[in-house]
Amino acid sequence: MKQEKLSLHDVLVRPIITEKALRLREQRKYVFEVNPLANKNQIKEAVEKIFNVKVDKVNVINMKPKPKRRGIFEGRTRSWKKAVVTLKEGYTIKELEGEH
């Protein structure tokens, strides 16, 4: 299967800012929503070049849709891809540290 080439800014959709994600930052782990077509190598390259840091490893989770109801209407949330990026010792993403 041929992998589609994504630009660096197309790979990362947005950072995930939750209590759990904020706790993970103490372990140098940052959580991002990423493009569903992106692979681990593309995510690593995008984080390293955009934030000027060194990435140790990338874990990827495919989030399944959840059923939702609004009155009598039934539907589902969209499926999406989440990446937990672990940075090498001594690196932090300063742009994301000021958000909490």
UniProtKB/Swiss-Prot annotation:
InterPro entries from the entry?
Nucleotide-bd_a/b_plait_sf, Ribosomal_uL23-like, Ribosomal_uL23/eL15/eS24_sf, Ribosomal_uL23_CS
**Repressor among the record's keywords?**
no
Q: Which UniProt keywords apply?
A: Ribonucleoprotein, Ribosomal protein, RNA-binding, rRNA-binding
**GO CC aspect terms:** ribonucleoprotein complex; ribosome
One Gene Ontology biological process: translation
Query: From which residue to which does the signal peptide run?
Result: none
Q: GO MF terms on file?
A: rRNA binding; structural constituent of ribosome
- In UniProt terms, what function does this protein have? One of the early assembly proteins it binds 23S rRNA. One of the proteins that surrounds the polypeptide exit tunnel on the outside of the ribosome. Forms the main docking site for trigger factor binding to the ribosome.
Q: How does it assemble?
A: Part of the 50S ribosomal subunit. Contacts protein L29, and trigger factor when it is bound to the ribosome.
The entry's family comment says:
Belongs to the universal ribosomal protein uL23 family.
> Which named protein is this?
Large ribosomal subunit protein uL23
Q: Which organism is it from?
A: Thermotoga neapolitana (strain ATCC 49049 / DSM 4359 / NBRC 107923 / NS-E)
Report the gene name: rplW
